[in-house]
Amino acid sequence: MVARLLLARHGQTEWHAENRYAGSSDVALTEEGLRQADELAGFAAAAGPSAVFCSPQSRARRTAEPSAKALDLPLRVVDELREVHFGLMEGRTRAELAEADPDAVARFLADPVSGAFPGSEPPADAAARGAGALRGIAADVPGETVLVVAHNTLIRLTLCALLGIPLENYRTVFPRLDNAAVTEIEIDGTRTGLLRLNQPARTRYWVT
């Protein structure tokens, strides 16, 4: 039975506002990020998902909390939805790393999988855990619609894994996911369909 998953990236954080890679680091939402969380809650209230899941990281939890509250639902934390650990890149901008290690940046830009930043979680591992998490959620909620709040790179890698897209293409096929924007997928066993990508969480975009 098909489950519909509404995948939302967390709201803006202090580091993302500065184009810093946050990864596994815990970084607070900005005022704009808090506003985006409230906007997502407005979307959730209109969409009416039956459950709200999120990553254990504070930026995802803080983004998901207003939606869970608006729906009077418990927030269900899934550890496997945490963001990719970026190793040497954590807390840095790409320009800063380019000064310290230009070869590392060049390898990443050429192939973000084989050229992943030194010390980072292997992208294939992140994609596998993300896909496993979403398939597990879908299996638990057959026929239902749920909201899942997670992270930019984790969601993009997971989409590639679920849709059969080569992982090394995740940055070109899915160049970005905006803060608090929603991507809609359907999962039925091992089959996944992409319905909408990176849509702003304003209810007028979701009238069907």
Where are these regions (language model features)?
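Acidic, low-complexity terminal tails and accessory targeting/binding regions
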Residues: 1-3, 84-96, 139, 144, ...
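Generic beta-sheet signal
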Residues: 5, 144-152
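Loop-to-helix element that buttresses phosphate recognition and phosphoryl-transfer chemistry
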Residues: 5, 12-70, 116-131
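Short active-site segment of divalent metal-dependent hydrolases/proteases
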Residues: 13, 154-155
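Surface-exposed helix-capping loop/turn segments at secondary-structure junctions
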Residues: 46-50, 139-147
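Conserved histidine-centered catalytic loops in small-molecule metabolism enzymes
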Residues: 48-80, 106, 184-208
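Phosphate-handling substructures
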Residues: 69-131, 196-198, 207-208
